Amino acid sequence: MSDSKETKALHFVQKMLEQSSEDKGLRATLRLAANPNTESRAWPVLIRWGVDVSGPEKDAYCLVMALAARYTGKTDGTLSLGEALRECFANDNESSGASSRLRRLFTCDSVQEAKLVLRPMLSLIQSRIPDRLCLSELLEDLIKFNREWSR
């Protein structure tokens, strides 16, 4: 992945966190991106960022926008998805919960399918370890999801 894409993802997440913490209307709009039936109401935000709302990147950005709206702070987390799942299940005797969720994610063939699998996973992570997941890393991973060399 190019540095410009990484920079764009990082900048996007930082701006979404910053702006949604200051603007309740924007926060409400970003939350709509989580639901496929209402995500089109958040598309103007994506269009301003130059995201093709008819392309596969739209799903990655919508998922991360909706999660950013649920963050309480203005800073991105530091944990990768795997690390966050491991922390969620740290007190369990087995790590089967985390590993089964990751295995299910690995079987996904598209960003759209990954989005459906990730939504409940991300809700669990946000409820157990709030604001610790690195959204910019998640966005970068989802953007390159369909490229064979990255899987």
Where are the language model's segments positioned?
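Basic, alpha-helical nucleic-acid-binding regions used in initiation and control of genome expression
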Residues: S2, K8-A66, Y71-R151
